[in-house]
Amino acid sequence: CMMFAVIASWISPAWLVALEGQPWAGLSQPVRGFSIWLGTFCLSLLIYFMTMHNHMGILYYPWQYFTAICPPYWEHFAETVSANFHVAWIMCCTVVVWFMEGIWERFPFTMIKTPWLRRLALFFGIIAISWALCMFFWYMQELVWGDAIRGHRRDAAPDWRWLHVGETAIFFLVPALFLQFYCGNWPNRFSTPINVLVRSLLVTLGGIAIYCLYYKYA
């Protein structure tokens, strides 16, 4: 359930932010809401089977070769058979959606005037930015804590590291939401690129502070 919820937490807001609620944006409620909910459910279910289901197949002995890809296809890249690898980049997607709607004001994708091109560029742009963040946080952990060791437990284990890549992304979401909801998305007096840059710097500093406090005392 948690893994499915992680996917839905990305797809549901992305459908409104990136795809602008299309193709049901012109419908009245509750038809529009139910249609987007159903679309979110179906797409999340498809992504679940592509990313998380194989993890379920290795939880049993012997591995469930007839119901899932065993070992999972991401094993060699992620250095683990755990679906925490997918949890990591999908959690980053959720965070980037909120960044895009809040502190970034969908910039620079708002400069694309063709509606269908803007929506697709924003949707896949969120995924691309999320992958970049995911890889950055992974290598940041290796710089701080050393290389991940497959078979190790706790903070040196690759599956633990991937999970905490997603959690690190959440650390940066906290100051972004604070800035958006409690500070009126400050600053607003400059041009959009300058506003976005200043907000991003503030969120970066806030995220680093939370990261340091969490791993020092948690």
Walk through the language-model features, giving the residues of each.
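Alpha-helical transmembrane segments of polytopic membrane proteins
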Residues: C1-A8, F34-S35, L45-F49, A68-V95, ...
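Transmembrane alpha-helices
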Residues: V6-S12, I129, G206
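Cytoplasmic membrane-interface regions of multi-pass membrane proteins
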Residues: A8-S35, Y61, T94-A121, L143-A148, ...
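Transmembrane alpha-helical segments of multi-pass membrane proteins
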Residues: S28-L46, P115-L133, T192-A209
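Membrane-helix interface motif
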Residues: L46-I69, A132-R150, A209-A218
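Intrinsically disordered, low-complexity segments enriched in Gly and acidic/Ser/Thr residues
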Residues: G151-A218
